[in-house]
UniProtKB/Swiss-Prot annotation:
Pfam family, one: PFK
InterPro entries documented for this protein: ATP_PFK, ATP_PFK_prok-type, PFKA_ATP_prok, Phosphofructokinase_CS, Phosphofructokinase_dom, PKF_sf
Name the record gives this protein: ATP-dependent 6-phosphofructokinase
Active-site residues from the entry: D127 (proton acceptor)
Biochemical pathway: Carbohydrate degradation; glycolysis; D-glyceraldehyde 3-phosphate and glycerone phosphate from D-glucose: step 3/4
Keyword annotations of the record: Allosteric enzyme, ATP-binding, Cytoplasm, Glycolysis, Kinase, Magnesium, Metal-binding, Nucleotide-binding, Transferase
Domain of life: Bacteria
Length: 337
């Protein structure tokens, strides 16, 4: 394989630029040419494809977002869109692609593979909801950004004796909420994977203020449960009388310079993706498991999902058998007593 392309797709995540940089520089070191594609699958279909060299990625490792831009392109789910994209790739002499993104991006890569066009996926999403990897690019940065924000909200919450509901991204997964909640010492964490009793949540707030002498109460809420405003309304209906505020951290979690960890795993996975294409291997997704590189079929990775669930004993079971987690939900309950 002499010429490959790389592009991000779907929602952006800190560290995508580091992955693109790694793909470009590794490929060049292996004697391959690299092309970039702007705006993901939309740019592929439109022919927004151009050469990338070491110079073009020279100052990108520390930047958040993605300099190749990104977009969602639902039309690629249709055969017409897929064939149009492949036609453009062949027109530019490209023999394989590296796709950086989440499950929607993986589905596109899966379609390319089914049409006999080698594609390798790299997990790039702050949600950390991709099967076949312990961590996705952008997750660590998003968690650190959330923790920094929650720490600051705790300051003002303590000053006024308030309850704060902090809504964080994550789509249908509670990973960001769990990690950020534990790291920030949240009083309660609400995630899609675990049922909750709104009356118990409300009574816990009251007990903390009246009997434990607390001057604040922080609830971290995953967006996959419901919106922060809707949750606050339910709290009031359940009898909460505290001075309640809602903060939605929103897209701020997608921005900012990536952490060292995100830069390293992005570089590691990007380099390995090139090695796979050089060997003529497509239809694979790169991941990290137990701090080692792993590969899994992109078909299974895109279809399986990586959401975790809880047993009656509170033990977290991850649907991806290659992924292990601490019992974070139970851990937080014990630490917030």
């Amino acid at each position: 394989m002499k010429r490959i392309a790389v592009f991000p797709s779907g929602g952006d995540a800190p560290g995508m630029n580091a992955a693109i940089r790694a793909v470009v520089r590794k490929a060049i070191s292996e004697g391959m040419e690299v092309y970039g594609i702007n705006r993901g699958y939309a740019g592929m279909v439109d022919g927004d494809i151009f050469p990338l060299g070491s110079k073009e990625v020279g100052d990108k490792i520390s930047r958040g977002g993605t300099f190749l831009y990104s977009a969602r392109y639902p039309e690629f789910a249709q055969l017409e869109g897929q064939l149009a994209g492949i036609e453009q790739l062949k027109k530019h002499g490209i023999e394989g692609v590296v796709v950086i993104g989440g499950d929607g991006s993986y589905h596109g890569a899966m379609r390319l593979t089914e049409h006999g066009f080698p594609a390798v996926g790299i997990p790039g999403t702050i949600d950390n909801d991709i099967a076949g990897t312990d961590y996705t690019i952008g997750f660590d940065t998003a968690v650190n950004t959330a923790v920094e924000a929650i720490d600051k909200l705790r300051d003002t919450s303590s000053s006024h004796g308030r309850t704060f509901v902090v809504e964080v991204m994550g789509r249908n997964a509670g990973d960001i909420a769990l990690w950020a909640g534990i790291a920030s010492g949240a009083d309660q964490i609400i995630v899609p994977e675990e049922e909750f009793d709104i009356e118990k949540v409300a009574s816990t707030i009251q007990y903390d203020f009246e009997h434990k002498g607390k001057n604040h109460h922080i609830i971290v809420l995953a967006e996959g449960v419901m919106s922060g405003e809707a949750f606050a309304q339910k709290l009031k209906e359940a009898g909460d009388k505290s001075d309640l505020r809602v903060t939605n951290l929103g897209h701020i979690l997608r921005g900012g310079s990536p952490t060292a960890r995100d830069r390293v795993i992005a570089s590691w996975m990007g380099s390995h993706a090139v090695e796979l294409l050089k060997e003529g291997k497509g239809g694979l997704a790169v991941g990290i498991h137990n701090e080692e590189l792993v590969e899994s079929p992109i078909l299974g990775t895109a279809e399986e999902g990586a959401l975790f669930s809880l047993t009656e004993e509170g033990k977290i079971i991850v649907n991806n058998p290659h992924k292990a987690r601490l019992d974070f939900a139970a851990l937080n309950r014990s630490l917030s007593q």
